[in-house]
Design a protein with these regions (language model features):
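Short amphipathic alpha-helices and their capping/turn segments at secondary-structure boundaries
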Residues: 59-63, 189-197
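Short, flexible, glycine-rich and Lys/Arg-enriched loop motifs at helix boundaries
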Residues: 38, 169-187, 197-217
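C-terminal substrate-binding subdomain of Rossmann-fold SDR/epimerase-dehydratase oxidoreductases
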Residues: 195-328
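Short, solvent-exposed loop/turn segments at secondary-structure boundaries
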Residues: 84-85, 140, 177-182, 287
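Short-chain dehydrogenase/reductase
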Residues: 90, 138-146, 181-189, 218-219
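N-terminal Rossmann-like NAD(P)+-binding domain of SDR-like oxidoreductases, especially those catalyzing
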Residues: 1-167, 171
Length: 328
């Protein structure tokens, strides 16, 4: 099959491209480069610079490359920014997806994988979040992802297209230093940045109902996340047209913010310098969000293989590639 991977020049997208190629699939990368880097696109892989809001460019790309399936990763994804710029997020994430689905269904593509998020769950009050846990997003970003799931499912049902929504938990790590996340919007790179600048990492709240009082999250290595896309793509092919899947992509194991910062101090060699400063809670931070990974394991025979230490170590190698002054 030939897969169009939107956002394929981004951090996660580049890993998905790599996994699909290794699985023997043909890939076309489609990215507007607002946050992506064309250097992440492998040699020999067709690259089209374009927006999912550009119907004409989408139509031409789908026709030129004979696209059979789509992995849609292109989106705006910063929670705080979505609160400040909600209409921008709805335009990019919802209207952009609508435009893409219109083009894809017109072109006759048969498979569609949608990059969703654990943000659709909002503030779940359960030990393990299953795919049937109620979805009550608490910010525009999460709302756009839930609306996206609805649109993808409805389009698939109407047009006989096999669809899947993959709800990512906390993505970390890197397959290679060159593919590492260069942003500082997630916990691990945020701690790296603080340590590099000579500042203490920050914990927002240590009075949660968790073992050490700090928030607990489920971290997934980006390489495992990428392999999950291959597993889901294979499942859609096996199950046929009209299939719809919704799956959590996580490890099913919680790590507290304090535990993660301590591990970062150990892996990076910063040790005592990684002792965090504790500030008051941020509004809207749930105490615990950890995936139940049972559906991926039992129905698709997929499990995450890499542990949290591998995530931190590989992310650190990437950070030091771009910030050599950070290494001790």
């Amino acid at each position: 099959m030939t897969w169009l991977i939107t956002g394929g020049a981004g951090f996660i997208g580049a890993h998905v491209v790599r996994a699909m190629l290794e699985a023997g699939e043909q890939v076309v990368v489609y990215d507007d480069l607002s946050t992506g880097d064309p250097a992440r696109v492998p040699d020999g892989v067709p690259f089209v610079k374009g927006s999912t809001l550009d119907r004409g460019m989408l139509d031409r790309t789908l026709a030129e490359f004979g696209v059979d399936g789509v992995v849609h990763l292109a989106a705006k994804k910063q929670v705080a920014e979505s609160v400040a710029l909600p209409l921008h997020y709805y335009r990019e994430n919802v209207h952009g997806l609508q435009t893409l689905l219109e083009a894809v269904t017109t072109a006759g593509a048969r498979r569609f994988l949608f990059s969703s998020s654990a943000a659709v769950y909002g503030l779940p009050d359960v030990d393990l979040v299953t795919e049937s846990t109620p979805c009550t997003p608490i910010n525009p970003y999460g709302e756009t992802k839930l609306a996206g799931e609805w649109m993808v499912r409805a389009a698939g049902a109407a047009h006989g297209m096999a669809t899947a929504s993959l709800r990512y938990f906390n993505v970390a790590g890197a397959a290679t230093a060159q593919l590492a996340d260069t942003g500082v919007f997630n916990l691990i790179p945020m701690v790296f940045e603080k340590l590099t600048q000579g500042h203490a990492p920050v914990i927002f709240g240590d009075d949660y109902a968790t073992p050490d009082g700090t928030c607990v999250r489920d971290f997934i290595h980006v390489d495992d996340l990428a392999s999950a896309h291959v597993a889901v793509a294979r499942a859609l092919e096996a199950r046929g047209d009209g299939t719809d899947l919704t799956v959590n992509i996580g490890r099913g194991e919680g790590v507290s913010v304090r535990e993660m910062i301590a591990l970062i101090g150990e892996v990076t060699g910063y040790g005592p310098d990684a002792e965090p400063t504790v500030l008051p809670r941020r509004a809207g931070d749930p105490a615990r969000v950890v995936a139940s990974a049972d559906r991926m394991r039992t129905e698709l025979n997929w499990t995450a293989r890499r542990d949290v230490r591998e995530m931190v170590a590989s992310a650190w190698e990437g950070w030091c590639l771009y910030h050599p002054e950070a290494r001790r």
